[in-house]
Every structure is written in structure tokens, then in C-alpha cells.
């Protein structure tokens, strides 16, 4: 590890960096940041590179940490001494994915933005793929699951936002009541000048969401 850039490995071969194949930094719009708080778990099978970790308290009042790798997902007990393989039946396959995690009504939901969005309704089983549009970004807002940069019907909509009904993260039915809906940041019938508008993430402030 470089003494000039604490936390960012610059002078070790990528093969020696177990939890990040030469990429232990993450890129977000306008910044580059190091993955703070991520340490090597010796119990990860085959020293699989870790891309993200999410700790939460389940409905059974127990703390768990979901450990996301390129092609595997594990659940660790609070003390990190035991783990369970919760990889979905169709495993994720994208290398260097940016994983995201949200809790909607106590339901853990995660995605790598490429292969699908998964839920974990039963802590005794593997992750289950959700029948909702694929999205590169997601956020919990007022108990609704918000999706950004959406893919629907094999078409990609970089400027589209979808939101579910409250406490129903799998119900995206568009209704006049506005409880489930969709918004596009570019006009589908426009002149094309807005085509560069792309959703890059969400932010919450009180009861508002910033895109």
C-alpha cells in the first residue's frame, strides 16, 4: 500500500490485491473515492474479490452483512465467523459491478445494475430475482422503490425514472393516483438535443428526492 495514498493500492500487483482486482476505488459523477471500511474476510471462499458490503438488521432482529462479489453473494453473521451462500439461481456475471442495496419495508433488495434486481424475503434461502424493470440506480424514498436509468422491453431509457407503490416494491403499475409511476427527463418527441440527459444516481433530503 502506498504511504502517499493511504487506502489506495498503487504499488502492488493486482493479483496480490484480493478484494479488488487492481480497482479498490469507485467512480461516481464528479469524484473518485476509495472503498473505506472494506477489509479482507479470510473466510470468503477461494479469496473471491469483494465489491461491496451491506450491513442491516433483519425482521428477526439479527444483524447480517451481505457480501457482494462478481459472481457470488454471501450472507455473514454479525461476528463474521460464519457465512451462507445466497447467490441467486442465475448467478451475477458482471465483473467490477457497482452494487447497490436498499431496504423497503424490511425487505432487502440489491442489484449490480446489470444482471437483475434481487430480493431476499427468506433468510434461509437464496436471493430471488424480482419481476420489475432493470435499472442501474435505485433508491428508497418514502417506502417506495425508485429506479433510474431503466431498461424495459429490451429498450434502454437512460433518462427514465420509475417508482413503485408505497411498501410494495414489486408493484409499478402506473395509475392516476400517482402511487406508482414513471417520468422521463427527455421528450420522446423532442429534437434530440436532450439525449445527453442521463440519470447518474439519487439523493434524499427530508421527503424529497433529487435525481
Region annotations inferred by a language model:
Residues 1-211:
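Recognizes the extracellular SEMA beta-propeller fold with strongest preference
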Amino acid at each position: 500500500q502506498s504511504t502517499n495514498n493511504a487506502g489506495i493500492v498503487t504499488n502492488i500487483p493486482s493479483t496480490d490485491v484480493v478484494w479488488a482486482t487492481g480497482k479498490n476505488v469507485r467512480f461516481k459523477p464528479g469524484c473518485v473515492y476509495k472503498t473505506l471500511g472494506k477489509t479482507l474476510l479470510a473466510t470468503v471462499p477461494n479469496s473471491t474479490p469483494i465489491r461491496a458490503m451491506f450491513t442491516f438488521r433483519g425482521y428477526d432482529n439479527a444483524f447480517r452483512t451481505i457480501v457482494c462479489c462478481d459472481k457470488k453473494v454471501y450472507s455473514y453473521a454479525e461476528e463474521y465467523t460464519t457465512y451462507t451462500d445466497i447467490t441467486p439461481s442465475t448467478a451475477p456475471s458482471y465483473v467490477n459491478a457497482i452494487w447497490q442495496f436498499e431496504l423497503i419495508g424490511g425487505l432487502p433488495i440489491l442489484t449490480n445494475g446489470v444482471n437483475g434486481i434481487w430480493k431476499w424475503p427468506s433468510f434461509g434461502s437464496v436471493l430471488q430475482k424480482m419481476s420489475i424493470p432493470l435499472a442501474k440506480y435505485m433508491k428508497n424514498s418514502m417506502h417506495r422503490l425508485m429506479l433510474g436509468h431503466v431498461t424495459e422491453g429490451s429498450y434502454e431509457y437512460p433518462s427514465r425514472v420509475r417508482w413503485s407503490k408505497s411498501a410494495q416494491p414489486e408493484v409499478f403499475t402506473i395509475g392516476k393516483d400517482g402511487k406508482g409511476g414513471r417520468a422521463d427527463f427527455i421528450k420522446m418527441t423532442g429534437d434530440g438535443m436532450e439525449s445527453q440527459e442521463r440519470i447518474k444516481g439519487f439523493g434524499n433530503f427530508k421527503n424529497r428526492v433529487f435525481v
